[in-house]
Each structure stands twice: as C-alpha cells, then as structure tokens.
C-alpha cells in the first residue's frame, strides 16, 4: 500500500472522529445492557452499536465539512483534511452521507422506530441545528449540542425496550448534564482557539467566572440526576456508590477553579479528563449493576 493511499485512508478515518465514536460506543452499550436486565440479544446489541457508530461517524464527517472555515482559524483543527484540501469537501461529504445511510438502515432493520427516531433527532440537532447555526451564533450552542451528545445511551436503551420510560428519561437528562461541564472545560483550555474562530462559547462570550460557576452547578445537578437511577430501582447500590464517589471527586476538582493560585488551563484539563473517567465508570457500572424493574412506558412507537 502506497504512502499516499495510507495517508488518504487515515484522513477518512480522522474525519469520523474515532475518539467520539469510542465514547459513544461505551454509552450506547451501557444504555442497552441497563435496559436488557440480563437478557442480552447479542445480535441486536452489536447491530445497535455498529449502526449508531456509523450514524455518529456520519455526523462527525459532515461536521468537518461545515466547520472547515472556523477549523482553519484554530490551532487544534487547522490540519484537518477538509482544511488542508488533502481530501475534497465533496468526497468527505459523500463519505459522511454514505455512512449515515448505512447506519440508519442498520438501525431500521434491527432495532425499532423509537430508537431510529432518537438517532435521527440527535443527528438533525447536531448537524442541522448545532453545527450550522448555534455553535457559531449563540452562547447556548453548547446546551443545544448536549442533547445530541446524550442520545446514544437512549438509543441503546430504547433498542431493547421499544418505549420511552423513566429510565430513558433519566439517561437523557444525565448525559445531557454531563456534556455541559465537559464541554466548558474544553472551551477553557482551548480558549485561544475558540476566541480566534469567534465561537461564542461561555468562557469567551461571558467570561471565566461564569464558566467556572456553570461547571460547578452542572456537576452538582448531574450528580443528583445520576442518583435517580438507583433511587428509581434501575440500578443497585454499586452504581450509587460509584455515582457518589466520582461526582464528589469531580465536584471537588471543579471547586479548585476558584483558588487564586490555580492555573486555569491545567485545571480545565483535569476537569475534562475526570469527566471522561466519570461517564465511563457510570456507563460500565450501569451495565453491570442493573436491576430488574417494571418498565412503564411514557411513549411507545409501533416497531
């Protein structure tokens, strides 16, 4: 295989943002296994994970096309293939659309209408609402984007149940809330990039003081909402213990941002890093510490 072909293939992989796909795989598996309550259909599980991964990859590829102008202004993203021209925008867009078609087809064939609906809503919000408009024009872009980031575990959950019940609602709220301090931490340690691209994330638009306050508040509310899973009977004492330990540590870490001698860049990286540990730990624990509970539907669609 020639070096040129290898580089091109690497470029196609990079536009799908493998790190984001991996994180979503963990969360969709967590939601799926929580809902399965020990009765795991492996074919359905892997079809859901692969299908949703392709949908996420599609959204990321299309996002690369949309963001190429602002990516050119940011140190972290200026070498993306859609910026350098190593791969044409048309090729990346076609690649992304193709991934999306295959991903949605897999979800439609193997899962159910509700799982497909949530995947579609998440896709439209991320690509159509967040990437095309909110990210560039509003300080609330992060809030809107948090919904699409919370969709994967809900898709995994609904792929099993075929209904929207309280467990799915808690997952949606929990993962949406987690996205906020996670994203604000990135915006702080990448402050110069966002400012250069004129992206109105909270630290840039309204200052570090407000950003630090929001990080603390969102972590606190995230902890409370996460505790609803065991309190509602969906998980057991192990999940409650992990929720308490990780959330308390994350909150204590966030509060250190108010120290006068703190290096904000280093602090934000720590908050970001521990956010990954927190959500991974909770996703794994919910998959293992599920409880058998009656799943009362709030919304059901015909499969």
UniProtKB/Swiss-Prot annotation:
It is found in: Cell inner membrane. It is a multi-pass membrane protein. Pathway: Porphyrin-containing compound metabolism; heme O biosynthesis; heme O from protoheme: step 1/1. The keyword Ion transport does not apply. One of its GO terms (cellular component) is plasma membrane. One of its GO terms (biological process) is heme O biosynthetic process. CDD domains: PT_UbiA_Cox10. The chain crosses the membrane at residues 18-38, 42-62, 91-111, 114-134, 139-159, 169-189, 213-233, 235-255, 274-294. One of its GO terms (molecular function) is protoheme IX farnesyltransferase activity. Keywords: Cell inner membrane, Cell membrane, Heme biosynthesis, Membrane, Transferase, Transmembrane, Transmembrane helix. The keyword Transmembrane applies. Converts heme B (protoheme IX) to heme O by substitution of the vinyl group on carbon 2 of heme B porphyrin ring with a hydroxyethyl farnesyl side group. Belongs to the UbiA prenyltransferase family. Protoheme IX farnesyltransferase subfamily. This is Protoheme IX farnesyltransferase 1. It comes from Shewanella frigidimarina (strain NCIMB 400). The lineage of its organism: Bacteria, Pseudomonadati, Pseudomonadota, Gammaproteobacteria, Alteromonadales.
